[in-house]
Amino acid sequence: MEYRKFGNTGRSHAPLGFGMMRLKRDENDQIDQAWVNETLRKAIDNGLNYVDTAYVYPGSEIATGIALSGGYREKVTLASKMPVSKLTCQEDFWKILDEELERLQTDHIDCYLMHALSRERWENYVVKFDVLSLMEQAKAQGKIRHIGFSFHDSLDAFKMILDAYDGWEFCQIQLNYLDVNYQAGLEGLELAASRGLAVVIMEPLRGGRLANVPEEIANMMPRGAVESALDFLWDRSEISVVLSGMSTTEQAEQNMEFASRASVGMLTDEERQTIIAAGDKMRAAISIPCTACDYCGICPQDIAISKIFAIRNQEQLDGDSVKAAANYKALGQRTAEKCVKCGQCVEQCPQQIQIFEELEKIHKRLG
């Protein structure tokens, strides 16, 4: 496996990182710890060495800590995140960080990110509570090793955050062949890399959407749908690690196989342009930029928001309104009909989707 330089940190990593947000769960919606142990450790044994989790991923940090026990913690770079939007005072920062260290069964987190920064979160939390100085203190104390941020907002906001601090060592952005001009996009990738930051990629398959593309799109790809989507990213020298939120053994084994042959410049010019053209065609067809992160899962009405958006986007791709209506009705009591427009989901959405407005339109169409 061809390892890549991680910015100016002195670290190097396999091209594939294990994202711990979408872990396999059992019939009671509990993380399958035995599966996590076996799958993550096997990946590490085969060269993977970057593991990404977060405070707000339900059960993830605890599961990660257990899986990395028995000597595996020392074999990886461990990344986790500070949920800045949960801060009410500076003391909260230390309480959360110490809780994360306990969950992860470690005395330090290698790569520590401010989670899901936007202009609003920067101004109302990072600046208000001087979180950068807290991050620097945590680094000086040895509780974290490298300071970074993950991001969900406009390119202008990304540039503002980059410019605001000279000590950034890495960042994490959403990027795939569908999102080349969305949020930070390719321009943000190139800018961050030009400043010496390592760049970690999330949502390489757009929450799984790019793994199951229409036949017309699949036929355009130089290789399989998943492999082509990952290769599009690994082809770029600016990218240090591509995260994949793997939830099945098959996904993990397949992605490790793809990563074993990943290299910078692996695509021909024709292959690059073909994949970009496929993205253009898909982007023209769909209207809701949902990645199925399920941060909206806090809905007090238990509406299946991400599933509803997936149904609508799939309808736009394949034109099958009959199937879309049937899939929507199959949600039973979890359709958009129950929405009371409380706005809790909108506050949590990293894609800044006006969720209840979209739900209302979809219900009128499919309900």
Regions found by a protein language model. Give the residues of each.
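Conserved, mostly hydrophobic/aromatic
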Residues: F6, F18, A43, V51, ...
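Conserved residues at the C-terminal ends of beta-strands
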Residues: G19, A54, Y112-H115, S150, ...
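A short, structured active-site edge motif that brings together acidic residues
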Residues: E74-K86, Y112-H115
